[in-house]
Regions:
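Short amphipathic alpha-helical elements of helix-turn-helix/winged-helix folds
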Residues: 15-19, 57, 69, 93, ...
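Short linear capping/connector segments at secondary-structure termini
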Residues: 71-73, 106-115
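Amphipathic alpha-helical interaction segments
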Residues: 11, 53, 85-89, 93, ...
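Amphipathic C-terminal alpha-helical segment
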Residues: 97-100, 104, 131-135, 149-169, ...
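Short hydrophobic/aromatic patch on the recognition helix
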Residues: 38-48
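Amphipathic alpha-helical packing segments from all-alpha helical-bundle domains
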Residues: 67, 89, 96-100, 112-138, ...
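Amphipathic alpha-helical linker/stalk segments
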Residues: 60-89
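Basic, helix-initiating cap at the start of DNA-binding domains
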Residues: 1-23, 27-36, 53-56, 61, ...
């Protein structure tokens, strides 16, 4: 990427962050972002394509460290740790990411509402959580893909905001961990089907 393109990208992403922090997701237009970044609207469109593309790119940037950690051996999130531990560590990190970026999560959800299950960041998170659940319960008993959707649904911005309003990120972590444990323990417990 050329240096001016890199500079413009950074200016646009930082302007988006500032507008989200100051005004929330409802008041962010591409015109406002372009003006705040000091670039033309055409520059913004060429780089991101749409408001959805802009929020997808910003979330991907915010989640980049998490993406790297899940691939790094030796970290609590990385290969080599037991899948249950990796799942808990990943969910804890998502809780932290949600707390720091709640306005971005809300903006991203609204922008991607038509097709949120095809968003690149969501797809990476879903594939990772699905693989960890499947590794934790190789004997089956749990639809790992559906369970991953259920766990990731805990990071809906409105739900996360509501849960964190009384107990902060510690409550969100506890609730999400409890859900993950219940799903995994329930899958390990044989039961008769009706």
């Amino acid at each position: 990427m050329r240096s001016d393109a890199t500079r413009n990208r950074e200016a646009i992403l930082r302007a988006t962050e500032e507008l989200l922090a100051a005004h929330g997701a409802e008041h962010i237009s591409l015109d406002r972002v372009a003006a705040a970044a000091g670039v033309g609207k055409g520059t913004l469109f060429r780089r991101f394509g749409s408001r959805t593309g802009l929020f997808q790119e910003l979330l991907a940037e915010r989640a980049a460290a998490l993406a790297l950690a899940i691939e790094t051996p030796g970290s609590a999130l990385g290969p080599g740790a037991p899948p249950e531990d990796r799942l808990t560590a990943f969910l804890d990190e998502l809780c932290e990411l949600a707390e720091r970026n709640l306005a971005l999560f809300a903006a991203h959800e609204r922008a991607c509402a038509e097709d949120k299950y095809r968003d690149p960041t969501y797809l990476r998170w879903h594939a990772h959580v699905t693989a960890l659940i499947a590794a934790a319960r190789p004997e089956g008993g749990l639809d790992a893909e559906f369970a991953a959707h259920a766990l990731l649904g805990s990071f809906d911005a409105d739900l996360a905001r509501h849960v964190m309003a009384d107990g902060g990120v510690a409550r969100l972590k506890s609730a999400v961990r409890g859900l993950a444990e219940a799903l995994l323990e329930g899958a390990a417990t044989p039961r008769t089907r009706r």
